[in-house]
Design a protein with these regions (language model features):
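Structured alpha-helical
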Residues: 1-114
Length: 114
């Protein structure tokens, strides 16, 4: 039975994340995104923990016009689940990270916040 309140979109976006304490940070690629959160894969998972608050930036290309528009969404989010790889010793093994948006994502287009 599906427990999600919001539908998920299968989107591949770049993810950049950082903690306020500077203890965790890195990059990843989204697996899916909804209005309430995101699930992404990252090799930079070692400093992450459930319940941790992070700053997120999601970016990608929008080709809905005649020319591509680069867009970035920024927000605060909380780690809900960390799916660590079975063999943690493999270099660059990726973990799945489920996050809930804590505030409404802000759209940044060419550096102008809307």
């Amino acid at each position: 039975m599906e427990r999600r309140k919001r539908p998920r979109l299968q989107l591949r976006l770049n993810v950049e994340f950082s903690s306020a304490e500077g203890q965790a940070g890195g990059f990843g690629i989204t697996d899916n995104v909804s209005a309430g959160g995101v699930y992404f894969l990252t090799p930079d998972w070692q400093g992450l923990r459930t319940g941790q608050n992070l700053a997120l930036r999601l970016s990608g290309m929008n080709n809905s016009t005649d020319w591509p528009v680069f867009r970035t969404l920024g927000c605060k989010a909380t780690v809900l689940r960390l799916d660590v790889p079975p063999d943690r010793k493999v270099p660059h093994a990726k973990a799945g990270v489920a996050m809930r948006f804590d505030d409404r994502p802000r759209v940044d287009m060419y550096g102008l916040t809307a």
